[in-house]
Design a protein with these regions (language model features):
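Acidic carboxylate diad motif detector
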Residues: 1-23, 199, 203
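Positively charged, helix-rich recognition surfaces that bind polyanionic ligands
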Residues: 27-319
């Protein structure tokens, strides 16, 4: 290996990063340099990532992101590169269930008759079959994590090419992933599950996506704005000039004038109409620009249906 001269580079610090890859430990040396990273160029000498100008309103959910900009509107799944991520998520679940079955078969003394784990100190034994499955599960999780990060970077670069002012709501993933505290019974007298959005947040990384977006815009000379909590983009109806609370299941809903809109996209449109002076929704901008962006939204939804793209929790039905 040839030595690399670092005399002309200011080195900030060095980090040793151990990783388990395909069952073997590997140690990587991370060199962190001072200053800003140089821009990337393609093989033709052009900038690899373009920086756009304009406003982008984005509604970041637990599994999807909807955005409205001066050039295009969009709605897509978070942290997804093709359809392979859904297959990988399913394989993670299958491996985890296989590990649980093996653990129960090897350690029956640690479980109650109803299947719950006994309290107190326990000694666990793991079979060779369990260890092999665990290694496969760990390797699959590692690959999925890398693919998620690559997908996040690709989406962040695309959004930066649409504009230089990014407007969104504050992060709330840490609150959504917590289990519900209240015990509620449904109409049949059964307990409602206390699980919320932990699995979706783990698979789609909305907070990681938002952090990457914030860093991307601020480092590249853009602006990142989080609206105040009283903004309530998901409840406002500009045709009625009122805040109307909706059910979580209402993904497609009708405005007061009878227009059907996709909920996430409409929230991104209201974020696009943010008034930086009053820190509130610019109602005049909503009225003047809604028809133009509504036509773009309808065209985009038709494109999703024609290409049979499954957008999670969007309410868009694919034949």
């Amino acid at each position: 290996m040839k030595p690399i001269a670092l005399a002309h580079i200011n080195l900030a610090y060095v980090t040793l990063v151990p990783k388990m890859i395909r069952g073997k430990y590997r140690v990587y040396l991370h060199l962190t340099l001072e200053g800003k990273a140089k821009p990337k160029y393609d093989r033709f000498g052009d900038l690899r990532h373009k920086f756009g100008k304009g406003i982008i309103g984005a509604d970041i959910g637990t599994q999807t992101v909807a955005y409205t900009s001066q050039t295009e509107v969009g709605l897509k799944n978070l942290s997804e590169r093709g359809n392979s991520i859904q297959k990988s998520e399913r394989m993670e679940r299958l491996y985890y269930r296989a590990m649980d079955r093996s653990r129960r078969a090897t350690n029956p003394q640690n479980y109650n008759t109803n299947g719950t784990v006994k309290e107190g100190h326990k000694t666990w034994k793991y079979s060779n079959h369990y260890k092999r499955i665990k290694n496969r599960h760990s390797e699959l999780c590692r690959i999925n994590a890398i693919n998620r990060q690559l997908a996040i970077n690709e989406d962040a670069n695309h959004l930066r090419s649409l504009g230089d002012v990014f407007i969104t709501e504050p992060k709330n993933a840490s609150k959504l992933m917590k289990r519900a505290k209240e015990t509620i019974f449904n109409s049949k007298g059964k307990l409602n599950r206390k699980k919320r959005f932990g699995k979706s947040i783990k698979n789609r990384c909305p907070s990681g996506f938002q952090t990457s977006i914030e860093k991307k815009f601020r480092v590249s000379g853009g602006a990142y704005i989080e609206v105040p909590n009283h903004y309530r983009a998901s409840q406002y109806d500009h045709t009625a000039d009122a805040y109307i609370k909706k059910k979580l299941s209402d993904r497609m809903y009708k405005l007061a004038d009878g227009t059907w809109v996709q909920r996430d996209w409409y929230s991104s449109f209201l974020l696009y109409c943010y008034d930086d002076q009053t820190k509130n929704i610019d109602k005049k901008k909503c009225v003047s620009e809604f028809n133009n962006y509504y036509e773009k939204e309808k065209t985009f939804i038709e494109w999703i249906k024609v290409n049979k793209i499954k957008v999670l929790n969007s309410g868009i039905k694919i034949a």
